[in-house]
């Protein structure tokens, strides 16, 4: 059946069709353009941050010389949940396959489908779908502190002496910045741009040398995705698990604590009676999605709560064939829900 769908979808995108009679698809029914309406799957994205700490070479002297408390001398790596997002995604519904048969008394033209056979547009081209993008935190490059060590620091005979001299250099850098900012330096920058350049360079030196005491903390975001099929009465289903040491884990990995998802139908659209469903479908069939309230929680706290379109909670309707007689009607569908986004007439 899939081969038929893809072959016919290519036909739809390249060759105009004079007219159509749309009906539920049955294999072997004859020539035509087969398309699917989507059903909803919930896409759960968990953005987690991996935090790695590497102690500095002079960490044991951090409190003594720089009054920095609680500086660890042990490397550490752990994870945090940054945020959770849930969105609706459409996948072909095998129970909603339709065929557009050719006939002579309609002005319906090209039919555009997705690669999966979902309907996108009739008599026009659907706009390009924007890819899902997240601004993720990435590890920053750190300056090599040895670039800013004085000769006295480099030839120091002991770690303790090196720590003492490095701390003095840090205080000298701070004093230089203060003198410049107060306008008390022997040689002042000529303009604001020069001033900023000097301050930025002094900040870079101070940060690099301070890392010898405070250590380096690197943060990196990762996106973990799980898919859930919506169903009425979905409550506290384990979608993924999370461990501070291991990060985001599959739902069946008991090394992490569960992340739960719940779904509640909101004002579902009445389902069409069976006798009306059996009526001949004359026109383009599309979805009217219902709505669902989605909640994701972890350790008793809500991480995400929102309303999303759910096709399983809605119904289907027919865009009557009369719209395509004698006039050119353009229709754009939402391939994620199968609903109509826009209708234009020439």
Residue ranges and their predicted role:
Residues 15-19:
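Sec/Tat signal peptide C-region and signal peptidase I cleavage site
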Residues 4-14:
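Sec-dependent N-terminal signal peptides
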Residues 20-346:
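N-terminal amphipathic/basic membrane-interacting segments and domains
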């Amino acid at each position: 059946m899939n081969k038929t769908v893809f072959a016919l979808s290519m036909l739809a995108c390249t060759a105009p069709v004079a007219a159509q009679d749309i009906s539920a698809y049955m294999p072997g029914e004859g020539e035509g353009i087969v398309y699917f309406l989507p059903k909803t799957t919930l896409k759960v994205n968990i953005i987690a941050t991996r935090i790695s700490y590497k102690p500095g070479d002079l960490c044991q002297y951090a409190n003594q010389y720089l009054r920095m408390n609680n500086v660890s001398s042990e490397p550490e790596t752990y994870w945090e949940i940054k945020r959770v997002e849930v969105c609706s995604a459409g996948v072909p519904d095998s129970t909603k396959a339709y065929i557009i048969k050719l006939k002579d008394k309609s002005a319906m033209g090209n039919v555009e489908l997705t690669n999966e056979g979902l309907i996108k547009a009739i008599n026009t081209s659907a706009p390009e779908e924007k890819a899902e993008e997240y601004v993720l935190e990435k590890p920053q490059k750190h300056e090599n502190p040895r670039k800013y060590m004085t000769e006295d620091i480099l030839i120091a005979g002991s770690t303790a002496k090196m720590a003492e001299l490095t701390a003095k250099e840090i205080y000298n850098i701070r004093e230089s910045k203060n003198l410049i900012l107060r306008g008390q330096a022997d040689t002042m920058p000529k303009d604001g741009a020069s001033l900023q350049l000097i301050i930025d360079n002094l900040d870079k030196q101070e940060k690099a040398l301070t890392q010898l005491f405070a250590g380096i903390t690197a943060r990196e975001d990762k996106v973990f995705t799980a898919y859930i099929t919506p169903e009425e009465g979905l409550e506290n289903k384990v979608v993924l698990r999370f461990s501070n040491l291991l990060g985001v884990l599959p739902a069946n990995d008991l090394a992490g604590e569960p992340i739960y998802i719940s779904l509640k139908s909101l004002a579902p659209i009445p389902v069409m009676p069976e006798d009306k469903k059996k009526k001949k479908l004359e026109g383009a069939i599309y979805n009217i999605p219902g709505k669902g309230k989605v909640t994701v929680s972890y350790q008793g706290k809500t991480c995400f709560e929102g309303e999303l379109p759910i096709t399983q909670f809605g119904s289907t309707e027919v865009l009557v064939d009369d719209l395509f007689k004698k006039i050119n009607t353009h229709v754009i569908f939402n391939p994620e829900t199968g609903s109509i986004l826009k209708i234009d007439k020439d």
